[in-house]
Amino acid sequence: MLSERDKSRGDIRLEYENRKKRLKQQSLAGRQYVDFTLVDSLGCERKISDYVGKSDLLFLDFWASWCGPCRAQEPQLVRLYQEYRSKGFEILGVSLDANRTSWLSVLRKKENHWTDLCIAKKEDDKRVRELYSINGIPYGILIDKSGKIANVVTAGWVHLEMLLKGYYKGRNEETK
């Protein structure tokens, strides 16, 4: 049985690890994205590089069929997509599902209109999680047209909405 002192040490270690992960996530901003391979619903391989640079902003939406919060936040993401797509915003869904059948089943029911892909192999899943410091989902990475990571979104899609408003407001002011 753990003493109160040992429990406290465990809490401190956990808090330390969480802070370390958050700092690593924050340090991704400004870096060039790292490419990785995914598969589409037909089993064809795709790469992130197939999508980067095609729009002003590309949002990588990391999710999974078993993730309740991911599914609960999807209507808000659909709304943001509808609002900002014509301005140059695109979404690429990246499923972390290990079970392709579960992914495809949920994909058929989703009401989004963006491309959804799935991690190709189990070893790719681990690599992607490490590369992008993913320790929970929903999780998002906003990539600009040049391929630089503009921001990491871990606090829900309200944070994404604030980023989009700021980005497009700034762009509108530049064109005046």
Region locations from a protein language model:
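Oxidative protein folding and maturation machinery
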Residues: M1-R46
